[in-house]
């Protein structure tokens, strides 16, 4: 029994698609079933559903503009969602939990290509530090439960994702869907150029969300 928290998001939906080919029962919870920002509702739902595995793909996400204009929402929502799910899984005796981190957890000036041991070695990228701080807290919370309780709670840090179910809203989208929409809009309007934010200097590594789902299933089985 695998509970995919955040099944409506791009990563969660990819996990549901991938798990459909596995010998498991997929569990999902809508906002009406449980508001994951509420500890009591989250713990009650997990206790009643009795999952063996929890995938924490639920999060408040967005691009540079969303991060910069809604910092409190990004920090608060993500802190409480991950904390509620991890504590609920612990209390319910869940056998394994997989928390989804993010590549933005690494320092802005981390050596390229980035290594896992670069975490917490320097200042974060200011444009998404609120989301990054919440993700770092989730990673450390899983480590703390492993150390204190022996819980099999692990974390995975995907690269920049794209694929089915992506967000194309220019106010909150990530770089790939934003580029696609801007270039398509320019082409449709017969414009010779399209405005792209940033300096063009940052290095990105992109990963299709279905490839991530394959990797996550592998981690659940063998890590």
Question: Where is each model-derived feature located?
Answer:
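N-terminal Rossmann NAD(P)H-binding glycine-rich loop of SDR-like oxidoreductase domains
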Residues: 1-21
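Alpha-helical substrate-binding/gating segment
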Residues: 147, 161, 176-194, 204-223
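NAD(P)H-binding glycine-rich loop region in Rossmannoid oxidoreductase-like domains
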Residues: 39-79, 88-91, 108
């Amino acid at each position: 029994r695998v509970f995919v928290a955040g099944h409506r998001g791009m990563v969660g939906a990819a996990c549901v698609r991938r798990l459909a080919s596995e010998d498991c029962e997929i569990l999902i919870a809508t906002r009406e079933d449980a508001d994951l920002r509420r500890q009591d509702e989250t713990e009650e739902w997990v206790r009643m559903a009795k999952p063996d595995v929890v995938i924490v793909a639920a999060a408040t996400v967005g691009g540079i503009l969303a991060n910069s204009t809604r910092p409190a929402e990004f920090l608060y929502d993500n802190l409480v969602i991950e904390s509620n799910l991890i504590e609920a899984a612990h209390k319910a005796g869940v056998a394994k939990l997989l928390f989804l981190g993010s590549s933005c957890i690494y320092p802005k000036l981390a050596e390229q290509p980035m290594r896992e041991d670069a975490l917490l070695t320097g200042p974060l990228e200011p444009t998404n530090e609120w989301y990054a701080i919440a993700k770092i807290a989730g990673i450390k919370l899983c480590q703390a439960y492993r150390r204190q309780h022996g819980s099999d709670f692990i974390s995975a840090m995907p690269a920049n994702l794209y694929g089915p179910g992506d967000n194309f809203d220019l106010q909150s989208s990530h770089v790939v869907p934003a580029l696609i929409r801007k270039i398509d809009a320019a082409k449709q309007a017969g414009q010779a150029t399209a405005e792209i934010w940033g300096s063009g200097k940052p290095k990105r590594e992109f990963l299709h969300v279905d490839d991530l789902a394959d990797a996550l299933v592998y981690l659940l089985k063998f890590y």
